[in-house]
Structure formats: structure tokens, C-alpha cells
Regions:
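Helix-turn-helix
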Residues: 31, 39-73, 77
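Secondary-structure edge/capping motif, primarily at the C-terminal ends of alpha-helices
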Residues: 93-97, 126-130, 159, 188-192
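Solvent-exposed, amphipathic alpha-helical segments
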Residues: 31, 35-43, 85, 89-93, ...
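Amphipathic alpha-helical packing segments from all-alpha helical-bundle domains
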Residues: 84, 88, 135-161, 171-183, ...
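Hydrophobic alpha-helical connector segments
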Residues: 77, 92-121, 201
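N-terminal intrinsically disordered/low-complexity leader segments
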Residues: 1-27, 216-221
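Generic hydrophobic, amphipathic alpha-helix propensity
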Residues: 25-36, 53, 78-86
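Amphipathic alpha-helical segments used for helix-helix packing
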Residues: 117-136, 153-156, 186-187
């Protein structure tokens, strides 16, 4: 004779050190991402093995494969983490100046170069190493580049004058400005931040001002 299982015998996983199993799993994943950001940013993706990542995170391979299917999947997560942090940082600085183009541009540029200088390892991953591993990043690299371009378009559109170009031409101009900014950051990192940040901000500010006048952006007329 079979009997129905007593539901009271089915117990959830017990918390360990005050954390649930899901919380511990999330913490391990975050530790692996943080380790990957450090190692990929310092040594480059091709030089870093899964064993090195696990040692840096103080975790075993079992926990690596619990969180990620491959080293490339971890690379994508690390890149996404860094770009998200950068976007949030510049938005915080730019938001108070959305109606004033020169102040908006200056705030965004100061925080861009400031983020790079404060976080050289993260910046190397985001600005330099990402260029070398675009194939491994798949669609993520292009998506984040487009996000940066879209952010520039969104904050600029409300400030445009009547002589604004078509959206397609406007997007090309935005891509050109973003590309120039990334190239400046790459060169600054490669020269170990030799050029004073004030010179970088002023020079890039003038570039944005020229584009702003061409677009008829209020504040640059």
C-alpha cells in the first residue's frame, strides 16, 4: 500500500551564515565578475585562464560553471558590468544640466575622463581590451557602442535648433564624436595618463562646441 508523501518533510535549503542558497550563488557570480574585470583589465582576455579567475575569486571550477557556460560568457558579463557602471556615473553628473548644453557637455566629459582615471583597470577593459575581443563579445560590443550614441542623441535632441540635419546624418555625427572620445581615452590610457585631464576636457569640449554650433544647439549659437 502506497502512502502520500508528507509535505512537511519537504524543507527548503537551510540558510548558511544568514544567507539563502540563491544569495550565496549570486555572491559567487559577482565575485567571478569582479575577478574577471581585474584580470582581463590588467592582463588581457587571451592571457587569463579559468583557473586564474577561480584563484582570484577564491572559488572552485565547480562554482565557475555553475555561473557561466564559458570564459567568453564571463567576459561578456564583466564588460557589461563595467559599461553599466560608467553609464550610471556620467548620467548622475549630466542629469542636473539637461537644459544647458555647455554645462551638460562639460559635466559628461569631466566624468568620462574622471572615471577612466579613477578606474584604470576597468577603463582598460572597457576602452582597450574590448576592441581586441570584439569577436568574443559578440553583439554586446556593438550594442553598448550604440547605447552610448543613443544617449548622446537623446540629451541633444531637445536642444536642437531649426537647422538640425536628418536623423540619419545626426546619428553619423554622434557616432563620430563618440568614436573620437573613445580614441582619446585609449591614447590617454596607453600613455599612462600623461596629459593633464584639464587639457583633455577643454580640447574635447571645443570639439563638442563645434558640432553643437553646426547643429544649431541652443547655448552654442
Amino acid at each position: 500500500m502506497t502512502t502520500q508523501a508528507d509535505d512537511s518533510s519537504i524543507k527548503p535549503a537551510r540558510p548558511y551564515a544568514g544567507k539563502s542558497a540563491q544569495e550565496r550563488q549570486n555572491a559567487r557570480r559577482l565575485a567571478l565578475v569582479d575577478a574577471a574585470v581585474r584580470l582581463f583589465g590588467e592582463q588581457g582576455f587571451s592571457a587569463v585562464s579559468i583557473d586564474m579567475i577561480c584563484a582570484e575569486a577564491a572559488l572552485t571550477k565547480r562554482y565557475f560553471y555553475e555561473a557561466f557556460a564559458s570564459r567568453e560568457a564571463l567576459l561578456t558579463a564583466a564588460y557589461e558590468s563595467v559599461t553599466r557602471e560608467y553609464f550610471q556615473a556620467i548620467l548622475v553628473k549630466m542629469t542636473p544640466h539637461m537644459a544647458d548644453a555647455p554645462k551638460l557637455v562639460r559635466a559628461g566629459l569631466k566624468e568620462t575622463f574622471g572615471f577612466v582615471r579613477r578606474n584604470p583597470v576597468k577603463a582598460r577593459l572597457m576602452m582597450v581590451e574590448a576592441m581586441n575581443v570584439r569577436g568574443q563579445l559578440g553583439d554586446m560590443y556593438g550594442a553598448r557602442y550604440d547605447d552610448f550614441v543613443e544617449l548622446l542623441l537623446q540629451v541633444t535632441r531637445p536642444l536642437l535648433g531649426r537647422q538640425a540635419p536628418s536623423d540619419k546624418v545626426f546619428r553619423v555625427m554622434a557616432k563620430a564624436v563618440v568614436g573620437a572620445l573613445i580614441h582619446l581615452c585609449q591614447n590617454w590610457i596607453a600613455t599612462d595618463f600623461a596629459q593633464p585631464v584639464d587639457e583633455l576636457v577643454e580640447g574635447t569640449e571645443r570639439l563638442f562646441a563645434g558640432v553643437g554650433r553646426e547643429l544649431g544647439v541652443r547655448g552654442y549659437n
